[in-house]
């Protein structure tokens, strides 16, 4: 039987060589070269992080904060590079989610599938 760590490294390499990863990396490089896009994305991600931390601490997000986040999201989506980056992130996220489902299937045999998904 092959070593699972070797397989994990093969998977890492396959992800790094995938079209989806290459597209994401390329979009990051383009945004790094565009100061406006870089700053917009940075501000948006900082706001996201701030709100996530509040939620994790059990602090209620105000209506004003929710509106600000929505406005920031709409603003960054209007920027072509950032919008493309988010699409690339989503595509890679789907792949990683699918891979996660596949590699956790053996655990479902032991613990069952609480989500009832296949």
From Swiss-Prot:
InterPro entries: Com_YlbF, YheA/YmcA-like_dom_sf. Pfam families: Com_YlbF. Transmembrane segments: none annotated. Belongs to the UPF0342 family. This is UPF0342 protein BpOF4_11360.
